Amino acid sequence: MPKPNAVSLGPMLDPELVTRARGALLGLVAGNQLGVPTEHLGTPAAIRAAYPDGVRDPATPPKASPYDDDAAMTLLLAESLAEQGDFDAADAAQRWVRWMKADGRGIGVLTRRALKLVERGVEPFEAGRRALAEAPQSAAGNGAVMRCVPVALRFHDNPDRLIRVATQQAAIPFDYVVSGSYSLKITVK
């Protein structure tokens, strides 16, 4: 249920905008799934070495786990933004915690640490700061960039809010300035 002061995404939405939003999220998930087989190989040379003829038969994801962490967390953020009408860090983080407990496919070390802290009652942004402080060598962060899609869709008409939320959503799993910077840069473009 939307908060009283939240902007509703209800019936006033332009149907064409809804169709475009669905298309953007579908394209994001499809592209992500196609990239999963090469995700941890690192360089183009490593990918060519592992797949000299290209990826011909991407691994089928497990039935119980259709999405990896980046896609799942992006879709859950989109769901939170749609249902809450605005960015609610606690709501998004709790959705991610439930997903982690039920599935958690592909979740990174820092994201898991931060979400476990959230599960224990730590405020989401503080959880991100603590997770990064405990294991700074584990910082990665392309998921923050993927999650810019629902942020841009929701706040396309409010650049100030778009910039703020793009940075905030990146800080929850782990407060890594590079993730926030890249997510902000890509969202604004």
Give the predicted meaning of each segment.
Residues 2-189:
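Structured, active/binding-site neighborhoods that engage oxygen-rich ligands
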